[in-house]
Design a protein with these regions (language model features):
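Basic/polar phosphate-binding segments, predominantly the helix-turn-helix DNA-binding elements
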Residues: 7-58, 75-100
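Residue-level recognition of oxygen-bearing side chains
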Residues: 69-70, 85
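Short, basic, alpha-helical segments at the C-terminal edge of helix-turn-helix-like DNA-binding modules
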Residues: 52-62, 100-116
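A short, glycine-centered helix-capping/turn motif at helix boundaries
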Residues: 31, 67-69
Length: 117
């Protein structure tokens, strides 16, 4: 493993809502933008900003599925400036708008009935 790439991944996971750029991420981990981009893509299989976009979608999907926060709140938590921008990116990634996806997930996985174990 590469400690710089590992640190970059940790930062993206810890602070997905930060307005990351490849320059800022490189500064944080002590690499030039080109060195970080090359190492990250080689080890992870995708460039850092693409990884961040995918991570934001994964985290957003988990928050939609497991919580009751509004789509606007989730959008901010995962780094989008607006609910509309998050909704567009989510639909492009998942194939459904966030609210429709959330409803479908809840129908597909109803809560357990703990009264009748």
């Amino acid at each position: 493993r590469d400690r710089h790439v590992g640190r970059a991944i940790a930062l993206l996971h810890e602070r997905p809502a930060d307005p990351w750029t490849i320059d800022e991420l490189g500064r944080q981990v002590g690499l030039s933008r080109s060195a970080l981009h090359e190492r990250f893509a080689q080890l992870v299989g995708q460039p850092p900003m693409q990884y961040l976009a995918n991570w934001r979608m994964q985290r957003g999907a988990r928050l939609l599925r497991e919580g009751n926060a509004t789509v606007a709140t989730i959008a901010q938590e995962v780094g989008y400036d607006s609910e509309a921008a998050f909704a567009r990116a989510f639909k492009r990634s998942v194939g459904q708008p966030p609210a429709a996806w959330r409803r479908a997930q809840r129908v597909a996985t109803p809560p357990l009935d703990v009264r009748n174990p």
